């Protein structure tokens, strides 16, 4: 039986997202109380409260280096944060509906936001420029991720499809069709040559990536 080390208390509403950093000494949590918090796993203490969103926080993620993290919100924005200082570095306001998921690539050079407006937006982390808006889904995008090589982005949508996009060009390279209802989750395997998608109708499908 596992032993509990800490109870992290501080949020005032549901916690819907959480992630460890790479070394495992920090956790970021996102809550419907509009805040994200960064916690020290060695002490259980809240290191920073990340404030600024005007709506529920839907998603969070650290970059691989652990010096940056992302938060996505129902307020239609995503924010890039300095983890050490707990300071907001930039606010991305390109979506016209709720931001439902965010993700860094493995290098931290790019990040992506996915929205209920049916698009995903790819950003250059260093410059803050939106390099591509991924357009093609006919419903909201609930999940987004990069492949391990950082050459492709995968999106999962309520339109019953997943799509794989080239990160260099923003072009859709593969559309995965077969689910009979909304797709809520998607992931690449470690090599990036296989994909799994999960749907509202209690099924998962495994696919071979063509990128």
Residue positions per predicted region:
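Conserved strand-to-loop turn within each blade of WD40 beta-propeller repeats
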Residues: 1, 12, 23, 29-33, ...
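Short loop/turn segments that connect beta-strands within beta-propeller blades
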Residues: 1, 41-43, 83-86, 125-128, ...
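A structural motif specific to WD40 beta-propellers
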Residues: 3-6, 45-48, 89-90, 129-132, ...
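WD40/WD-repeat beta-propeller blade N-cap
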Residues: 9-15, 51-57, 93-99, 135-141, ...
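WD40-repeat beta-propellers
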Residues: 18, 30, 36-40, 60, ...
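Loop/turn segments within WD40 beta-propeller blades
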Residues: 19-24, 61-67, 103-109, 145-150, ...
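Solenoidal tandem-repeat scaffolds enriched in leucines and small polar residues
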Residues: 26, 30, 37, 41-98, ...
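Blade-level signature of beta-propeller repeat domains, shared across WD40, Kelch, NHL, RCC1
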Residues: 184-211
């Amino acid at each position: 039986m596992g032993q509990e080390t800490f109870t992290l208390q501080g949020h005032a509403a549901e916690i819907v997202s959480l992630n460890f950093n790479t070394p495992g000494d920090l956790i970021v949590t996102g809550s419907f109380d509009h805040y994200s918090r960064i916690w020290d796993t060695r002490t259980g203490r809240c290191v920073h409260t990340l404030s600024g969103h005007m709506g529920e926080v839907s998603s969070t993620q650290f970059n691989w280096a652990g010096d940056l993290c992302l938060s996505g919100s129902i307020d239609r924005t995503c924010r890039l944060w300095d983890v050490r200082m707990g300071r907001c570095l930039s606010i991305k306001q390109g979506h016209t509906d709720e931001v439902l998921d965010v993700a860094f690539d493995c290098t931290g050079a790019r990040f992506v936001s996915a929205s209920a407006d049916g698009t995903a937006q790819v950003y250059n982390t260093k410059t803050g420029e939106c390099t591509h808006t991924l357009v093609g889904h006919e419903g909201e995008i609930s999940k987004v991720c990069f492949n391990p090589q950082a050459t492709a982005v995968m999106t999962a949508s309520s339109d019953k499809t997943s799509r794989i996009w080239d990160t260099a060009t923003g072009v859709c390279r593969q559309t995965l069709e077969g689910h009979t209802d909304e797709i809520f989750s998607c992931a690449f395997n470690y090599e990036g040559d296989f994909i799994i998608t999960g749907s509202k109708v209690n099924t998962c499908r495994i696919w071979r990536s063509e990128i």
